[in-house]
Amino acid sequence: MNATTEQEAIVKVLFTTTEQGLELPESKRLLLVPADIRRYGLSRVLNSESMLNTAAPIPFDFLVNGTFLRTTLEDYLKENGLPFEKTVTLQYVRSLVPPAYEASFEHDDWVSSVDLLSATSSAGKWSGSSFLQGQDRILSASYDGLLRIWNGSGQALATSSVVNRGPLCGLKSAKFMSSTKIAAAGLDRTVRIWDYTEADDHFSGQLKPTLELYGHRSIIESLGVDGSSRRILTACADGSIGLWTTSKKLAPEAPTALLPQTYATKRRKGSTTSANIIAQRGALSLIPVHSRPVSAAIFDPQNQHTAYSASQDHTLKVLDLTTSRVVSTITTSNALMSACYLSNKSAPLIAAGTSSRNVTLIDPRESAAATSVMTLRGHINVVSSVSASPDNEYSLVSGSHDGTCRIWDLRSVRPAAGKEETGLGSVGESVYLIERESLGDKKRPLAGEGVKVFDVQWDKTWGIVSGGEDKKVQINKGRNIISS
């Protein structure tokens, strides 16, 4: 600083960006700015006539060494022990837009699972021409054993019939396979396929069970689906992975020993009729993979023969579905409670929610030098669900038993620091926190008691939709929550 006072201090900055169409000419990238400037001031500078000369102001955020600038440049330099003479590289990106609360849909019991149907969702794309424009729907599964289909106005268009009564009725997972087909499973160890039809006015619908898939001997924790190939993956509490098809012709017969007693008796006597019996089938394969419950099983969207399974035994397995064999095993430090696939140009990544309250990013390739790429910290209870952004490859949302959802931007990272973060590699912190609206003005219980989030999904049309212990589906929307 020498001859200048703190009030007069200036800092040389170098502006960079990966935003297409918003690059500065080489001659304008270096600039002297006041040391006390903040994000808003920097954003105004960039939008000015002498810089980008934007037709309308674009709000920007700025990354410095992988973290968002939330102070003045002066404070940043002081906090990091850097001289004012240092050139600061600022990567500018379009500002993050907070997800705004939109609506909640009431249920009679805990909401265990949600899935989304829209023109931009996987199920909408799998539906092809059968998907009708504007037929955006939410699927919810609950511990009362019921499936519900909702429209955007909060109207329950259809509710499934009760298949089981008693302690085994609860559902753990449900997925759209198309606009007319749904897969669901849970405590009774059975996968059920439902056909969904709507009335001509689209104000009511009907759910009809058409196929039951038997093979597991324990609770089914979650489902992975690929509507294009009509296949389903199941993650079972007994440590096994199931591969199934919804094609009655291709699926093998169901094992008689696992069928409900009434049906098994009728089948032995040859008295079954198509009029009163839902078709039953078995698994294409059941793979004993893990030593503890499997939390998630997901298809690789880039390779139809590959799948991934995450387990409470601390491992992520890469599976060859053609041979039903484990290709590789990646051991982590904690029990894995959820997982999703992140599309990435440089390498595939699996985001796994853990029992240690973190989200771990894992490179599943055998050739990877380091399997744990990054750790996302911020939750204070188990991370029960993760979902990738529909807009880009560097953001995701997580849901936790602490009663919150957190949005993460993987461009904002820092090196691990201190004993607490030893071995975590790069560390990321959330950019937004979504609370449960059901709390109202009440303070959130520390461990999330009463408002635990069990599932969250992110779709370009719907936004972020979550369900949980408060018996509600909650919708939070925001255009370009994290801009691509």
Swiss-Prot record:
Compartment(s) of residence: Nucleus, Nucleolus; Nucleus, Nucleoplasm
**Region named Ubiquitin-like (UBL) domain:** 11-94
Q: Which Pfam families match?
A: NLE, WD40
Q: Which UniProt keywords apply?
A: Nucleus, Repeat, Ribosome biogenesis, rRNA processing, WD repeat
Its Gene Ontology cellular component terms are: nucleoplasm; PeBoW complex; preribosome, large subunit precursor
- Look up the signal peptide feature and give its range: none
Q: What's an example Gene Ontology biological process for this entry?
A: maturation of LSU-rRNA from tricistronic rRNA transcript (SSU-rRNA, 5.8S rRNA, LSU-rRNA)
Recorded GO MF terms: ribonucleoprotein complex binding
WD repeats located where?
Answer: 121-160, 166-204, 215-254, 289-329, 331-372, 378-418, 448-484
Biological function: Component of the NOP7 complex, which is required for maturation of the 25S and 5.8S ribosomal RNAs and formation of the 60S ribosome.
Q: Identify its protein family.
A: Belongs to the WD repeat WDR12/YTM1 family.
Note the subunit structure. Answer: Component of the NOP7 complex, composed of ERB1, NOP7 and YTM1. The complex is held together by ERB1, which interacts with NOP7 via its N-terminal domain and with YTM1 via a high-affinity interaction between the seven-bladed beta-propeller domains of the 2 proteins. The NOP7 complex associates with the 66S pre-ribosome. Interacts (via UBL domain) with MDN1 (via VWFA/MIDAS domain).
Q: Which PANTHER family match?
A: RIBOSOME BIOGENESIS PROTEIN WDR12 (PTHR19855:SF11), WD40 REPEAT PROTEIN 12, 37 (PTHR19855)
The name this protein carries in UniProt is Ribosome biogenesis protein YTM1
Q: Which organism is it from?
A: Pyricularia oryzae (strain 70-15 / ATCC MYA-4617 / FGSC 8958) (Rice blast fungus)
Q: Which gene is this protein's source?
A: YTM1
